[in-house]
Regions:
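Short loop/turn motifs at secondary-structure junctions
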Residues: 42, 121, 222-226
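Short, charged, solvent-exposed linker or helix-capping segments at domain edges/interfaces
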Residues: 43-44, 92-95, 202
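Extended interfacial segments that mediate partner engagement and assembly in macromolecular machines
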Residues: 72-84, 88-162, 171
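Active-site-proximal structural scaffolding
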Residues: 120, 131, 184, 231-232
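RNase H-like nuclease fold core
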Residues: 137, 141-229, 235-237
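Short acidic (Asp/Glu) and glycine-rich catalytic loops that position anionic groups and cofactors
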Residues: 92, 239-240
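Short, conserved catalytic/metal-binding motifs centered on acidic residues
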Residues: 31, 43, 82, 127, ...
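Short, conserved DNA-binding cores of transcription-related domains
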Residues: 1-87
Length: 240
């Protein structure tokens, strides 16, 4: 299929090409994509390449803003039939590294969410607002990015800062004895380097001194010794 080479170069998303760019009735820029990655025709179950296309489908993954404003992505891709008789998968749709199957965000947008919090020092709420993504999505992206970039052993610090974040409402469930149990606490505690320079150390659900003490106890044996006793005490006392 023909595509706009200049627009594809500018859009720069691996595995796809821009076939058309236009504005819809509301003035939103619409970017139509087609697949260029030949491996997208391989069955994700058995790996065999298909040569029989069943239909075209359109998905609308969200991407980074372009030119300072969001764009509406419409990826026109094919549904293929797997002809391998030993494979239980009948059909599959194309996927590329930046847009896996059933993904609602491009990989680079998800990565930008994590970088904004872990590397950029923005709160989850602020990063979500800036990038147009919901709190849960940014939070998961933050966890994923942190696992990739944070060292296995936490760097030492003399002071820990606590950042309390609230998301949504508490979720409760009723137990057989009529009592209620908290299933999801809306409050989370983030542990950061209060001396500056080392960013986020970790995050736990809850908003109590017990949550702080539990997190400290789970750290490597050598690590809490570097935290000033006076500062650690004030840190725990600061939690209700």
């Amino acid at each position: 299929m023909d595509h706009d080479t200049g627009a594809t170069l500018l859009f720069d998303l691996e595995g796809v090409a821009v076939s058309r760019v236009y504005r819809d009735a509301d003035g939103m820029r619409v970017v139509e994509l087609v697949t260029t990655d030949e491996t997208a025709t391989a069955c994700p179950s058995c790996g065999s390449f298909s040569s029989r296309s069943k239909e075209r489908v359109v998905t609308r993954p969200r991407d980074l803003p372009h030119g300072g404003s969001p764009v509406d992505i419409r990826w026109v891709k094919r549904r293929w039939e797997c002809r391998e008789v030993r494979c239980e998968r009948g059909t599959f749709t194309e996927q590329v590294s930046q847009i896996p199957a059933r993904a609602r965000l491009t990989g680079r947008l998800r990565e930008a969410c994590g970088q904004a919090v872990v590397d950029g020092g923005r709160t989850v709420i602020q990063a979500g607002r800036d990038l147009g993504v919901s709190w849960p999505v940014v939070m998961q992206a933050t966890r994923d990015h942190a696992e990739q970039v944070l060292p296995a052993t936490l760097p030492t610090t003399e002071a820990i800062g606590i950042d309390e974040i609230r998301r949504g409402r508490a979720v409760w469930r009723e137990l057989p004895d009529g009592k209620w149990e908290l299933v999801a606490d809306p409050w989370h505690i983030g542990f950061v380097d209060a001396t500056g320079g080392q960013g986020l150390f970790g995050q736990v659900e809850g908003r109590t001194s017990a949550s702080v003490q539990k997190w400290l106890a789970e750290q490597p044996g050598h690590w809490p010794r570097f935290v000033s006793g006076e500062r650690a005490l004030s840190c725990s006392a600061g939690c209700p």
